[in-house]
Amino acid sequence: MSSRENPSGICKSIPKLISSFVDTFVDYSVSGIFLPQDPSSQNEILQTRFEKPERLVAIGDLHGDLEKSREAFKIAGLIDSSDRWTGGSTMVVQVGDVLDRGGEELKILYFLEKLKREAERAGGKILTMNGNHEIMNIEGDFRYVTKKGLEEFQIWADWYCLGNKMKTLCSGLDKPKDPYEGIPMSFPRMRADCFEGIRARIAALRPDGPIAKRFLTKNQTVAVVGDSVFVHGGLLAEHIEYGLERINEEVRGWINGFKGGRYAPAYCRGGNSVVWLRKFSEEMAHKCDCAALEHALSTIPGVKRMIMGHTIQDAGINGVCNDKAIRIDVGMSKGCADGLPEVLEIRRDSGVRIVTSNPLYKENLYSHVAPDSKTGLGLLVPVPKQVEVKA
Amino acid sequence: MGQAQSDENSIPTTTTTNTPPPSANSPRDSEDTSSPSMDSLLAEAAAYGEDDNENESLEAKAQRALDCPCIADLRNGSCGSQFSEAFLCFLKSTAEEKGSDCVNPFVALQSCINANPDAFSKSVTGDEKETEKKEEQPPVQDHRIIPPLWAKDPPRSGNSKL
């Protein structure tokens, strides 16, 4: 049996080895990152409820700004200067909207994926969630895409297809699926120089697309962690009644391309959907529907607050409705308000506070606006500030 | 299809600096006995080989792997030598992040591909199964997408900011 010109069992493993080599090479070429091995088993059911960890950090909308994303992790002591996880057993929830408005969307997806794996090893955990911009992009709604955003996906597509060619040359590997299958070469009423970028973006992000499948299927749409429920826009009682686990599984199934076609389930579309709702995140406190919020919260046993992104809070992270609604989208991305990164921290023993890089809240209130104010631990402001008037 | 034409493809070169200290900072890792990631993929693969020689050096194993007939096309293409080096390095890598100790050969392979975009196309390597036309034969699906304003043609007045 073993008397070929190369009498080695090793040749049997080559297709598998080539495949992982090519994947690693493509990842590196796209992101500059070598991912550590994935410690989590694939295809496990998406978890919806989690015990309250010792330390929980919540991070708002990132919108294609890698630098600000890094800062957000840094001010909470979650990564070091070379982006390695230093958060130990901390649990992080990023409430969605990684995509759109900036040009480093894929780099952030890779950055988060790498940290997820490192955190897992250290006993920590990072949850990432679907925001309305994830849903829109999967659906082909590219209204908030930037030029750089098209370029980055184009680069991904080029390397991805090259990787497929390499795999095709290795006899013994199945012919990889063409990511562009069924995508038109041109689009009406669109500039011709955008066709390629748009095609790449559709290929990557449509249901069952390689990027959607690889990264976005791991996102929760709702998550209960201890006494907090996380969602990008907001939850109404009807959503909770429908079933949080059911929502997570259905959205994930849709992104996987299993069923549902192009468009997301109804509770992800429109103003009252879980990723679009603003009833609890209006900046003006008096516009928030505290009654609806309390009603919704009362239907999830043990939960006393809802933590949301989606609506930019010019005044920084804050709480309304007796801090039952905590709003953490500080518009940090350059493509949004270019806001100062702030994150929310909940410790099991000492409650809720805000970690900010805003120099105003630094130790010496009026001393200096230090140029280094963006690094290091910001002052921890006790209890979410109650903000009623917008600046 | 013009792949890999942009300079930005080589961006990763700049991120090469922080070569990781192998698994230095995972405090909870200590009791993880097996830690399979620290073996090279090659050693792992060889362990399943039917007639594997335990005493053979990793280097020799890697060389033997390179001689496998099924990768002849990859090895002989116009970026064949860069491929071989990168693949060899990857096989031998014992880093936590497989391949992270192979930045140089990876970058060399990238540059070669940037200079020879068709390095791994079938036609180049003499395989003529390329007869299938590159048109889009599968039916084009419904892809009515909503483009960003700046990509519309003709351009909209009231230009929105990006």
Curated annotation (Swiss-Prot), chain A:
It holds the Pfam family Metallophos. The active site is at H133. Mn(2+) 2 binds at D97, N132, H232, H295. Disruption phenotype: No visible phenotype under normal growth conditions. Induction: By infection with the bacterial pathogen P.syringae. Its cofactor is Mn(2+). GO terms for cellular component: cytosol. Its main location: cytoplasm. Its EC number is 3.1.-.-. The keyword Disulfide bond does not apply. It is an enzyme of class 3 (hydrolase). Keywords: Cytoplasm, Hydrolase, Manganese, Metal-binding, Protein phosphatase. Mn(2+) 1 binds at D61, H63, D97. It is found in: Cytoplasm, Cytosol. InterPro entries: Calcineurin-like_PHP_ApaH, Metallo-depent_PP-like, MPP_Shelphs. Binds 2 manganese ions per subunit. GO terms for molecular function: manganese ion binding; phosphatase activity; phosphoprotein phosphatase activity. Expressed in roots and siliques (at protein level). Shows phosphatase activity, hydrolyzing the artificial substrate para-nitrophenylphosphate (pNPP) in vitro. Belongs to the metallophosphoesterase superfamily. SLP family. This is Shewanella-like protein phosphatase 2.
From Swiss-Prot, chain B:
Keywords: Disulfide bond, Mitochondrion, Oxidoreductase, Peroxisome, Protein transport, Redox-active center, Translocation, Transport. Required for the import and folding of small cysteine-containing proteins in the mitochondrial intermembrane space. Involved in the mitochondrial oxidative folding of the copper-zinc superoxide dismutase CSD1, the copper chaperone for superoxide dismutase CCS, and subunits of the mitochondrial membrane respiratory chain NADH dehydrogenase (Complex I). Involved in the peroxisomal oxidative folding of the copper-zinc superoxide dismutase CSD3, and the fatty acid beta-oxidation multifunctional protein AIM1. InterPro entries: CHCH (IPR010625), CHCHD4 (IPR039289). Residues 1-61, 119-162 are annotated as: Disordered. A motif (Cx9C motif 1) lies at residues 79-89. GO terms for biological process: protein import into mitochondrial intermembrane space; protein targeting to mitochondrion; protein targeting to peroxisome. It is found in: Mitochondrion intermembrane space; Peroxisome matrix. A motif (Cx9C motif 2) lies at residues 102-112. GO terms for molecular function: protein-disulfide reductase activity. This is Mitochondrial intermembrane space import and assembly protein 40 homolog. Disulfide bonds join C68-C70, C79-C112, C89-C102. The keyword Transferase does not apply. Its main location: mitochondrion. Residues 76-120 form the CHCH domain. The gene is MIA40. Residues 125-145 have a biased composition (Basic and acidic residues). One of its GO terms (cellular component) is mitochondrial intermembrane space. Disruption phenotype: No visible phenotype under normal growth conditions. Residues 9-18 have a biased composition (Low complexity). It comes from Arabidopsis thaliana.
